[in-house]
Amino acid sequence: MPATSRSFMKRAIGATLLIAASIVGCTQLDAWQREAIFSPVTEQQSWWRDPPEGTQEFDIALADGDKIHAWYWQSPKPNAPTVLYLHGARWNLNGSAFRMESWTDREYSMLAIDYRGFGKSTPRLPSEETASEDAVAAFAELVRRQPDPRKRFIYGHSLGGAVAIDLASRKDLPEYAGLIVESSFTSIGGMLGTLKYGWVPGLNFLVTQPFDSLDKLATLTAPILFIHGTADRVVPHEMSDALYAAATKVAPDLRRLVKIDGASHSSAVRSGNTYWSAVANFTRDATAAYRHRKDDASPDNARQARQAG
């Protein structure tokens, strides 16, 4: 097929999609995308697990009367970091329990939630906006349970990584020590580009749930650890390269990217020493960096700096 014909066909397909979207209507298009992106599974799966032993189960009430279901596991170590875990698409807390258990086995305190539409949370079709609201409510609970910001960490896997980045980018968010993003993507538009028909013009204009992490990362200054398996067949691991590159305001020694050789989309957390050494070193260094930032910003140090000048 001549190049001009191929170009015309691409434009024609793009125009057809735009016309179809207009016919279907924005409301239906939005609902379809939300269902496709979050894909919450409501049927019990044989491999789902109960929460780790000693976990508290409770609900967090939202201002509109909805609720999000939460699990909290308290480490026996008094100085352990406390991690807010934001899971990805499809699986609820029971489907993600293996990931939480991997962290609690290493005695990290952990708070995990189901977005609305998942598990025992209020049944509704989730969206980027509602997931963001749920994460904000969960972080408020994290602050209540962990008053020391040096020990607060945000951790998101896959879609949860995008939710975590959005949460961390909020200007009114209470302080935290660091952000951990695992197996996540640059944006929904970026993910469309990896699909068979991702070249079709106009697709990005149809996205109602952008989850655009790149611009948000460009505003962050707190330490960030990106983790990705090189055998991920859901989200290309190169997307973590782009996420890492976007976090330009983070100090170079506190902006880290770890690739887990041979790990799939969900198995990095099970990969052993490479993963857990990266996490342990990061949480230690981010905690120390927070302390130093606060020491440098103290009134006494500021006064000494002015006098020295």
Where are these regions (language model features)?
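An N-terminal hydrophobic leader/cap segment in hydrolases
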Residues: 21-61
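Hydrolase active-site cap/lid region
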Residues: 163-216, 222, 270
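Short alpha-helix in the alpha/beta-hydrolase fold that links the catalytic acid
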Residues: 99, 222, 236-246
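Short beta-strand/loop motif that positions the catalytic acidic residue
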Residues: 220, 226-228, 232
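C-terminal catalytic histidine-bearing segment of alpha/beta-hydrolase fold enzymes
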Residues: 242, 249-309
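Membrane-embedded segments
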Residues: 63, 67-141, 145
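Alpha/beta-hydrolase fold nucleophile elbow
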Residues: 146-158
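Acidic catalytic loop of the alpha/beta-hydrolase fold
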Residues: 231-235, 265-266
